[in-house]
From Swiss-Prot:
Post-translational modification: May be phosphorylated on Tyr-500 by csk-1.
Ranges of residues in domain Protein kinase: 240-494
Name assigned to this protein: Tyrosine protein-kinase src-2
All residue ranges annotated as the SH2 domain in the record: 124-216
Activity regulation: May be inhibited by csk-1-mediated phosphorylation at Tyr-500.
This protein's record includes keyword Kinase: yes
The species this protein was found in: Caenorhabditis elegans
GO molecular function, one term: signaling receptor binding
Gene3D superfamilies: Phosphorylase Kinase, domain 1, SH2 domain, SH3 Domains, Transferase(Phosphotransferase) domain 1
Superkingdom of origin organism: Eukaryota
């Protein structure tokens, strides 16, 4: 994969833009305090994003970046590219707007729109994005040779980066700003506006690896900060309709449903007596505040009557089912990428000092674009209130995924989650095989205490198995952090293809 941004400026006489092969970095993302003009019409003057904490002094036109379907009667539905007039932005992350074409008014999520003709409104602008994430986006099957995006530079605060797909690799170029205004990739070819620069390289490569083609596809709409503008955690269960059962587990059933008639949701229906409603509501309030692209969004609960209902966003299927049904269609880099996404979500929980306690493929959800989200984080602590004997015998306890200090002494920490993550990695590379095949829970406890670890699965790269072994160190303090696991797996995503080809023979 192409790119190493941050090299020296091209010399004044350079005849082509400078790009290099990729060295994936993990630098922190800098702020981008100003937006360049993209054409004859000036972009937003307030910075990279509109200040949502102030009134927009005059009504302003914004363009929809994604489709949004109203979730309540007070919301406003719109489609991508619709023009919306913002009337009031004092409601935090939900703004009151008028649809220019229909005249209808209602609340909209502010992160679904951008000021008309600003850089953020352009389909090729992706804002703050790491190089490795740009590469993953561009190499997605939705994109073809020549697909491109513009993002904020990781290493230079006021610069931008152009990322371009060339066949099955990605090249990166720095877009620099001139002191007197204007932009360039090669000094010999400056442009008055960013729009002019993009248009030029769409017409001809002129030193780039390829002519710019279609903007990179944005496959997912962003999460809204809350489910609705007037966010209610406890909702009337009459507003939740169950359509069909899509799963079941030790604590209850999972249903596809609708909230407020037309909003698709998943509904976890807990078995009666599973949890005390007061305790559950207190814990669920904490869980609801956890927001990350790789965590399943919790929308609402119904706790006033049995059974307790948990309303969440709807995903297509759980990872275990996906692996068993379609996992063999994936190449090793895709399996590693799935693992890295889980590590990213767990790194956020780690940062928030929140323990999952039941990390396994059955509790990871996935869609057709191979984007995953972690589910059921924290539920185990609320729901697993069994006696000590029942827990240790594994009646309602996932022994094969549980770290020895947690299974034996009930010591659950982020490091016990790391152990479980190592077990999850075996599920991923074996397409959903049960861990410790042929062994009972009691045998697993005994053998793991004696130092036994699962051998390297067939077809698994040695470097990936080494990560598993690090997760299974007896001393919890010597296990890696999820932040470390994330970048290790992201580096594996860029592993020499020869190892993947060799590993793929067993598929």
């Amino acid at each position: 994969m192409g790119s190493c941004i941050g090299k020296e400026d091209p010399p004044p006489g350079a005849t082509s833009p400078v790009h290099t092969s990729s060295t994936l970095g993990r630098e922190s993302l800098p702020s981008h305090p100003r937006i360049p003009s993209i054409g004859p019409i000036a972009a937003s003057s307030s910075g990279n994003t509109i200040d949502k904490n102030q009134n927009i002094s005059q009504s302003a036109n914004f363009v929809a970046l994604f489709q949004y379907d109203a979730r309540t009667d007070d919301d406003l539905s719109f489609k991508k590219d619709d023009i919306l007039e913002i009337l009031n932005d004092t409601q935090g992350d939900w703004w009151f707007a008028r649809h220019k074409a229909t005249g209808r008014t209602g609340y909209i999520p502010s992160n679904y729109v951008a000021r008309e003709k600003s850089i953020e409104s352009q389909p090729w602008y992706f804002g703050k994005m790491r190089r490795i994430d740009a590469e993953k986006c561009l190499l997605h099957t939705l994109n073809e040779h020549g697909a491109f995006l513009v993002r904020d530079s990781e290493s230079r605060q006021h610069d931008l980066s152009l990322s371009v797909r060339e066949n099955d690799s990605v090249k990166h170029y720095r877009i620099r700003q001139l002191d007197h205004g204007g932009y360039f990739i090669a000094r010999r070819r400056p442009f008055a506006t960013l729009h002019d620069l993009i248009a030029h390289y769409q017409r001809e490569a002129d030193g780039l690896c390829v002519n710019l083609g279609a903007p990179c596809a944005k496959s997912e709409a962003p999460q809204t900060t809350t489910f609705t503008y007037d966010d209610q955690w406890e909702v009337d269960r009459r507003s939740v309709r169950l359509i069909r059962q899509i799963g079941a587990g030790q604590f209850g059933e999972v249903w596809e449903g609708r909230w407020n008639v037309n909003v698709p949701v998943a509904v976890k229906k807990l078995k009666a007596g599973t949890a005390d409603p007061t305790d559950f509501l207190a814990e669920a309030q904490i869980m609801k505040k956890l927001r990350h692209p790789k965590l399943l969004s919790l929308y609402a609960v119904c706790t006033r009557d049995e059974p307790i209902l948990i309303v969440t966003e709807l995903m297509q299927e759980n990872l275990l089912t996906f692996l068993q049904r379609r996992g063999r269609q994936c190449q090793m880099p895709q399996l590693v990428e799935i693992s890295a996404q889980v590590a990213a979500g767990m790194a956020y929980l780690e940062e928030m000092n929140f323990i999952h306690r039941d990390l396994a493929a059955r509790n990871i959800l996935i869609n057709n674009s191979l984007s995953v989200k972690i589910a059921d984080f924290g539920l185990a602590r609320i729901l697993m209130k069994e006696n000590e004997y029942e827990a240790r015998t594994g009646a309602r306890f996932p022994i094969k995924w549980t770290a020895p200090e947690a299974a034996n002494y009930n010591r659950f920490t982020t490091k016990s989650d790391v152990w479980s993550f190592g077990i999850l990695l075996t599920e991923i590379v074996t397409f959903g095989r049960l861990p410790y095949p042929g062994m009972t829970n009691a045998e697993v406890l005994q053998q793991v205490d004696a130092g036994y670890r699962m051998p390297c699965p067939a077809g698994c790269p040695v470097t990936l198995y080494d990560i598993m072994q690090q997760c299974w160190r007896s001393d919890p303090d010597k296990r890696p952090t999820f932040e470390t696991l994330q970048w290790k797996l992201e580096d594996l995503f860029n592993l020499d293809s020869s190892e993947y080809k060799e590993a793929s023979i067993n598929f």
